[in-house]
Amino acid sequence: MQVDLLSSAQSAHALHLFHQHSPLVHCMTNDVVQTFTANTLLALGASPAMVIETEEASQFAAIASALLINVGTLTQPRAQAMSAAVEQATRSQTPWTLDPVAVGALDYRRRFCVELLSHKPTAIRGNASEIMALAGVANGGRGVDTTDAAANAIPAAQTLARETGAIVVVTGEVDYVTDGHRIIGIHGGDPLMTKVVGTGCALSAVVAACCALPGDTLENIASACHWMKQAGERAVARSEGPGSFVPHFLDALWQLTQEVQA
C-alpha cells in the first residue's frame, strides 16, 4: 500500500486557490462548535453560513459553494433539515461533505448517515472508528473519541471511497486522504489539538470548502489537513495550554494565508 506525501508547493497552491475563490460554506454543524468552525473558515478566507431551518436550509444549499453535514448534535428536526439540504445540494450539484460524528457508538445517527450516503457525498471526514463504522467494518469509538489508529482504517476508507465516490479523510496522529486508489498521508499537528473541542469539526468545514475549488480535489482536501496541522504546530509553540491555544490557532491560519499572498 503506497502512501504519498503532500508537497509544500501543492499545499501553498491549494491555499492560494482557497483565498482566491473564498468559498461560501453552508455549515449544518453541531451546536458545540459553530463559533470555532465559523472563525476557522473566516481566518482562511472563506465565508461561513449557519442555516439550519428546513425550508431555508434547502434554499441555501442551492446558493452555497459547498455544504457541510455534521451530525454531532443530531435531532430529528435537524435530520429533516439536513436531508432536505443534501437533496437540494444533489439537485444543484453543490459539493457536500459528511462528518459522521460518533456513528460507531450510536445507532440512530449511524442509520441516518448510511441513508445520506445514497446522495453521494463529495467528501467524508471522520476519525478511524467513525470511518470503520460507516464502512460497516466495525462498531466502536468512545462517543466522539476514536479507539482505533488512523492507519488501521485505511482499508475501510478505501472501500468507502470506492462505494460512494467520495474522497475519504481519516484523521489522527497522521491524517490519510483517499479516493479509493491514491492515498495521501499528512503528518504534523500536536496532541494539544485534541484537548480543544472542534478542531476535527472545523477541519470538516475546511474540507467542504476545498471541495468547491478547481483542480485536484484529493490534493486540495489533503492540503486542508496540512493547513490545520501546520497552524496547530505554530499555535502550540505560542500557547500555555488549551485556553490560549484557540486564539493562537486562528492567528496561525490567518498568517498562513498572508504568506501565500506575499
Swiss-Prot record:
Keywords: ATP-binding, Kinase, Magnesium, Metal-binding, Nucleotide-binding, Thiamine biosynthesis, Transferase. Pathway: Cofactor biosynthesis; thiamine diphosphate biosynthesis; 4-methyl-5-(2-phosphoethyl)-thiazole from 5-(2-hydroxyethyl)-4-methylthiazole: step 1/1. Pfam families: HK. SUPFAM superfamilies: Ribokinase-like. One of its GO terms (biological process) is thiamine biosynthetic process. Gene3D superfamilies: 3.40.1190.20. It catalyses: 5-(2-hydroxyethyl)-4-methylthiazole + ATP = 4-methyl-5-(2-phosphooxyethyl)-thiazole + ADP + H(+). HAMAP family: Thz_kinase. Catalyzes the phosphorylation of the hydroxyl group of 4-methyl-5-beta-hydroxyethylthiazole (THZ). This is Hydroxyethylthiazole kinase. It comes from Escherichia coli O1:K1 / APEC.
